Amino acid sequence: MVATCNNGEILHVLFLPFLSAGHFIPLVNAARLFASRGVKATILTTPHNALLFRSTIDDDVRISGFPISIVTIKFPSAEVGLPEGIESFNSATSPEMPHKIFYALSLLQKPMEDKIRELRPDCIFSDMYFPWTVDIADELHIPRILYNLSAYMCYSIMHNLKVYRPHKQPNLDESQSFVVPGLPDEIKFKLSQLTDDLRKSDDQKTVFDELLEQVEDSEERSYGIVHDTFYELEPAYVDYYQKLKKPKCWHFGPLSHFASKIRSKELISEHNNNEIVIDWLNAQKPKSVLYVSFGSMARFPESQLNEIAQALDASNVPFIFVLRPNEETASWLPVGNLEDKTKKGLYIKGWVPQLTIMEHSATGGFMTHCGTNSVLEAITFGVPMITWPLYADQFYNEKVVEVRGLGIKIGIDVWNEGIEITGPVIESAKIREAIERLMISNGSEEIINIRDRVMAMSKMAQNATNEGGSSWNNLTALIQHIKNYNLN
């Protein structure tokens, strides 16, 4: 089935993903979903980012016949002083590189604008961190759809913090809890858990803070906003947020699960560790394995990694601990443990097939940094969580898990400004206590209830993406809105 405009031409949507795996994976999956509905989908990115998912897109064309393609723009490596191949925040190998990548983004704006003018799409589906796309959409008289990574609850929290400013009350101590006013639930925070932009005065604003202000302005000027969530996870917040925002809002998540129904579960298919991980999981008992991953960007000090390793070892719980590709392990990792499947646990460097791990019957828990994708993937496959938020919006994402009763907390109170984790080191005893509480206390009423709730939510997530489900219908409605825009 082909989606056409009023002039008989196939509806053409251009997708512009941000240069970070946590952002580009769901947005590329959104492009695949549109293509599966007969929409011509063009993904605009840089060469080395395209390599990560090109084989999946090629198979979508070759096997499924989808009208989807990738167009690349040269990344300005030499101009910003980066080695060839470093084109995303995940590939950065030093603290200085993210700043250079941000600079590169500003240099990419003009060539991207020129390419969009050349391609003449009927709609731009843009990551939130490309606020300038609202201007090019206005110039071309086409709708701009903004992709927001987080759940409605998270954005409702952020909105109400900015409006009501409960964290600005006099004499509020860093360790004191306060309630965020006006929300459907009583949600509490400590000042130390808030993102830096909320705690700074206006004269302390950084370049990134200014970008966030541009993002907020572009939201108001966009035709609509898409969230990677599903109605049944947060019905009160879907309704609440949609009343707050002027642009229309849609949600057709979980995108990872929705897209897996097309053909391939994993977007990034080239995992060197696939066979090691799957063979090892196949040898474990059902629900016995703790999966530990803090994303591909966070940089823990060796002292913290050592505490985590000690806790995992002492708990006697089988585990998979995923480390960054260039993580230095010599000083803290027990000798012989790296990728040694004869051990009770696996330490794996680099990318792993996370969706496959989540779906495996041996996986019984997930220690997570509360990245948006990770939380949603755990919910989708019914895996209860141990939450350990670090930076960005992760303390807000933790509230989704807390309010819905889908896991337990390590108890982190300090937000980090960047990917270099400098907060207080959490001792192994505290980490071990959380691991054993979730993984060994399976007979306790608390853990039984958590597992029941997350399994029920998993069924709702999967039903939402079935034909006639809430997310399926939202995707259908969005495509129709874009068609109607082009009729006017």
From Swiss-Prot:
Induction remarks: Induced by wounding.
GO biological process entries: steroid metabolic process
Annotated tissue distribution: Expressed in the shoot apical meristem (SAM) and tuber.
Positions of the catalytic residues: 23, 127
Short name of one Pfam family: UDPGT
Binding annotation for UDP-alpha-D-glucose: 352, 354, 369, 373-374, 377, 393-394
Catalytic function, reaction form: solasodine + UDP-alpha-D-glucose = solasodine 3-beta-D-glucoside + UDP + H(+); solanidine + UDP-alpha-D-glucose = solanidine 3-O-beta-D-glucopyranoside + UDP + H(+); tomatidine + UDP-alpha-D-glucose = tomatidine 3-O-beta-D-glucopyranoside + UDP + H(+)
E.C. number(s) listed in UniProt: 2.4.1.-
Record-listed an anthocyanidin binding positions: 23, 392
Gene Ontology terms for molecular function: UDP-glucosyltransferase activity
Keywords: Glycosyltransferase, Transferase
Taxonomy, superkingdom: Eukaryota
InterPro entries xref list: UDP_glucos_trans, UDP_glycos_trans_CS
Similarity-based family: Belongs to the UDP-glycosyltransferase family.
Function in brief: Glucosyltransferase involved in the glucosylation of the steroidal alkaloid aglycons solanidine, solasodine and tomatidine to produce their corresponding glycoalkaloids.
Identification of the protein by name: Solanidine UDP-glucose glucosyltransferase 1
Designated gene of the protein: SGT1
